[in-house]
């Protein structure tokens, strides 16, 4: 799994100019599923995301997790995180999981997140418009294959 984690003041996703989901303070996740991602990868990602201390405490130090601040998550599927850009100028996406596998994995990932933190989503495979107000900005890239 490759996940871009962004700390946000607020975020929302629309599809066909209709608001699908929105959150207040929390995390926007851009989630890419690879063909060899496993339950172990999912468990690792969920554990890292919900416990990562990237929110400021009273002294302004990044010392609080999303759980500590009662924040929310907006999770957006993004297969383009697995783009292969080595050859030519057009990215190839052969390193992304096949759509059916990725969709099921993404749904299970979101259910696991929901057990820990209120989680909203876009729609897998849809053309989405994502709006966010970055906080910091704080942006972290999590790759479950690099641990």
UniProtKB/Swiss-Prot annotation:
Motif Gly-cisPro motif, important for rejection of L-amino acids per UniProt: ranges: 136-137
- Localization: Cytoplasm
Please state what class of enzyme this protein is: hydrolase
- One GO location term (cellular component): cytoplasm
The record's EC number reads: 3.1.1.96
UniProt key word RNA-binding? yes
Coiled-coil annotation reads: none
The protein's UniProt keywords, in alphabetical order, are: Cytoplasm, Hydrolase, RNA-binding, tRNA-binding
Q: Does the keyword tRNA-binding apply?
A: yes
Q: Which family does it belong to?
A: Belongs to the DTD family.
* Oligomeric form and interacting partners: Homodimer.
Q: What does this protein do?
A: An aminoacyl-tRNA editing enzyme that deacylates mischarged D-aminoacyl-tRNAs. Also deacylates mischarged glycyl-tRNA(Ala), protecting cells against glycine mischarging by AlaRS. Acts via tRNA-based rather than protein-based catalysis; rejects L-amino acids rather than detecting D-amino acids in the active site. By recycling D-aminoacyl-tRNA to D-amino acids and free tRNA molecules, this enzyme counteracts the toxicity associated with the formation of D-aminoacyl-tRNA entities in vivo and helps enforce protein L-homochirality.
What's the domain remark here? A Gly-cisPro motif from one monomer fits into the active site of the other monomer to allow specific chiral rejection of L-amino acids.
HAMAP family recorded? Deacylase_Dtd
What protein am I looking at? Answer: D-aminoacyl-tRNA deacylase
Q: Which organism is it from?
A: Streptococcus sanguinis (strain SK36)
């Amino acid at each position: 799994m490759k996940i871009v984690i962004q700390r946000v003041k607020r975020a929302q996703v629309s599809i066909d100019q209709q608001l699908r989901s929105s959150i207040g303070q929390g995390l926007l996740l851009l989630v890419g599923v690879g063909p060899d991602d496993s339950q172990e990868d999912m468990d690792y990602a969920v554990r890292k995301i919900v416990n990562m201390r990237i929110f400021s405490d009273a002294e302004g130090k990044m010392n609080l997790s999303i759980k500590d601040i009662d924040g929310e998550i907006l999770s957006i599927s993004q297969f383009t995180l697995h783009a292969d850009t080595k050859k030519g100028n057009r990215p190839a996406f052969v390193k992304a999981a096949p759509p059916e596998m990725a969709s099921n994995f993404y749904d299970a990932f979101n259910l696991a997140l929901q057990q820990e933190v209120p989680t909203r989503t876009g729609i897998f495979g849809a053309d989405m418009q994502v709006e966010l107000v970055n906080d910091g900005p704080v942006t972290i890239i999590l790759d479950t294959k690099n641990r």
